[in-house]
């Protein structure tokens, strides 16, 4: 089957984990890995897998975009450089999947709003953050039943799973995740907190979600909605587990999640990598299917 060719920008933890997932995709073919450090482990792994690489940043990729038929690019660098990367590549007709908190394109959380993006001509979609991908489906599971006045999430991740790019973007992480809790999750007001835990051995990703509903919560409907949404996320992140809840206390609905990774690049405790990269891969696969269908229709 024909595949859509892709480039990955940023060979850190997220970019390298994503590479493993794209190599298993039935519709995506990673062909380039872009970095800035010649000694990067991610670039070395990409070369081992047969990808072309450059340590000259996106400028090193641009001359090859058309010739190598790159249609989709994943940016796993940082919010500070994403806009420049996106402008250069979208000008060449490349669709950007943004894994930074830059959020210059609309937020995408696959089980909540991916279908809406397929119907639009967006050239750039933003995957929010790892904390957003883990928690916003739960906020939405409550808000689709009844209005949510306030949604608060706490994402706790292992220090070892958090690379330098994410550490530079902590403020952007909280702003972007809070915004997406409102715009995608459906809460009127959102707040996000990230805890980077230095414990050894590293702890698995844990997420706590609190929602304050308008009026007494509909216990049965919210419980059913939460369980249904967990199954939706598990379609692309099998290690997404409801540990407790939903717990009801007055107007507060609390959900407690755990996210175990597949162990592709970092061990299974790094579920924060997995939920981000799996969501990005799932999103890109839907775009690729759309591209392939359009090509077949005009053939």
Curated annotation (Swiss-Prot):
NAD(+) binds at residues 161-169, 272. The active site is at 130 (acyl-thioester intermediate). The keyword Aminoacyl-tRNA synthetase does not apply. InterPro entries: Acetaldehyde_dehydrogenase, Acetylaldehyde_DH_C, NAD(P)-bd_dom_sf, Semialdehyde_DH_NAD-bd. It catalyses: acetaldehyde + NAD(+) + CoA = acetyl-CoA + NADH + H(+). GO terms for molecular function: acetaldehyde dehydrogenase (acetylating) activity; NAD binding. Keywords: Aromatic hydrocarbons catabolism, NAD, Oxidoreductase. Its EC number is 1.2.1.10. It comes from the Bacteria. Pfam families: AcetDehyd-dimer. Coiled coil: none annotated. GO terms for biological process: catabolic process. Belongs to the acetaldehyde dehydrogenase family. This is Acetaldehyde dehydrogenase 1. The gene is mhpF.
